């Protein structure tokens, strides 16, 4: 059984890494452990549990900046920014349902280390693009800082970009600063019904190339569409999200519907059902470990959007799948 170290502050983290280095012990760095079921099991001697490093240390809504300890719950952070009518623009996925964990079990450090991003990535980027600053401990047991507490900083080489997506293999982050942005006033989703995968990806490509500022583009084949929140369709459904102030969303929806009429039947979802749908897509709810799919293996495949349908032909027909990121992400 792997031993666990649970530091109380950044100095404890530094001491733990220095000890592991001196004793030639391999460390597994975890925030709240919500993503440990991903990939193959790590071959480590000691777990460095950072959940004790918790709490928001700075939040300036007017400056669009938030700083928190690495082990701070994402639920706490999202509730705080929502109270100021703001959001995390990279729309971090909650892996909990997919991996058999409770909802909201992830930490800020885990979201950054995994470079999480939801459906809005095609418009706003991933966690890396909203990561402003960090304090961390290197593999040599040395504390270092990178970035700062401002949206635009010129503090030298941007190590933040390297740490995002490193899964804790390059450093143990202790304090993190991220960018927040205003929450959209409303949203609607345009739905195309009955398209096959090839035509759906063409339609999504046309929508993304338009001036409609689409913030989510997904295709849900008929065998799985009915399992997504907000939908009652038994047909293949191609979903295109529009966000912003109400008059703009209304105008862009009308423009997008006119653009896509030639692809077939077009309808739309209002704000409430749209939010439910995109939350379900973001968290891959139909594949939840405690859902109908059970504990089956789940693959996450990134590809060129235009090649998504071609790749899908190589997947066994017995497998369930859907597309996000305009065809560039296949679950």
Predicted segment positions?
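Substrate-recognition/cap regions that form aromatic- and gly/pro-loop-enriched pockets
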Residues: 281-331
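Short glycine-biased active-site loop of nucleotidyltransferases that positions the nucleotide triphosphate
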Residues: 36-42, 229-231
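Short Gly/Ser/Thr- and Asp/Glu-enriched loop/turn motifs at secondary-structure junctions
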Residues: 43, 233-235, 323-329
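C-terminal substrate-binding/cap subdomain adjacent to the FAD-binding core in PCMH-type
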Residues: 113, 132-288
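A short linear hydrophobic-aromatic micro-motif
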Residues: 26, 213-218, 318-322
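Short, conserved charged micro-motifs
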Residues: 15, 75-77, 197-202, 246-254, ...
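N-terminal glycine-rich flavin-associated loop
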Residues: 1-27, 50-102, 112, 116-149, ...
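Glycine-rich beta-strand-to-loop/alpha-helix junction loops that act as flexible
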Residues: 29-35
């Amino acid at each position: 059984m792997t031993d666990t170290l649970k530091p109380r502050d950044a100095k404890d983290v530094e001491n733990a890494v220095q000890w592991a280095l001196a004793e030639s012990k391999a460390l597994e760095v975890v925030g709240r452990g919500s993503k440990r079921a991903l990939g193959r099991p790590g071959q480590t001697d000691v777990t460095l549990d950072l959940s004790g490093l918790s709490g928001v240390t700075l939040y300036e809504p007017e400056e669009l900046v938030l700083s928190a300890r690495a082990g701070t719950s994402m639920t706490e952070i999202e509730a705080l920014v929502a109270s100021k009518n703001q959001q995390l623009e990279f729309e971090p996925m909650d892996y909990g349902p997919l991996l058999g964990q409770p909802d909201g079990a992830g930490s800020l450090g885990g979201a950054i280390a995994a470079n999480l991003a939801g459906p809005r990535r095609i418009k706003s980027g991933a966690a890396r693009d909203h990561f402003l600053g960090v304090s961390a401990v290197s593999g040599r047991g040395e504390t270092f800082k990178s970035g700062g507490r401002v949206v635009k900083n010129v503090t030298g080489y941007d190590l933040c970009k390297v740490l995002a997506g490193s899964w804790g293999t390059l450093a143990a982050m202790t304090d993190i600063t991220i960018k927040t942005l205003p929450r959209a006033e409303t949203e609607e989703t345009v739905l195309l019904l009955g398209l096959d995968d090839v035509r759906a990806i063409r339609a999504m490509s046309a929508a993304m190339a338009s001036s409609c500022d689409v913030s989510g583009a997904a295709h849900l084949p008929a065998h799985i569409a009915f399992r997504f929140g907000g939908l009652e369709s038994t047909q293949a459904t191609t979903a295109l999200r529009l966000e912003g102030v109400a008059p703009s969303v209304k105008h862009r929806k009308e423009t997008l519907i006119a653009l896509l009429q030639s692809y077939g039947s077009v309808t739309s979802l209002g704000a409430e059902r749209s939010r439910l749908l995109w939350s379900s897509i973001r968290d891959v709810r139909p594949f939840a470990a405690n859902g109908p799919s059970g504990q089956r293996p789940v693959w996450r495949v990134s590809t060129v959007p235009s090649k998504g349908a071609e790749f899908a032909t190589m997947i066994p027909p017995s497998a369930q799948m859907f597309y996000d990121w305009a065809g560039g992400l296949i679950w």
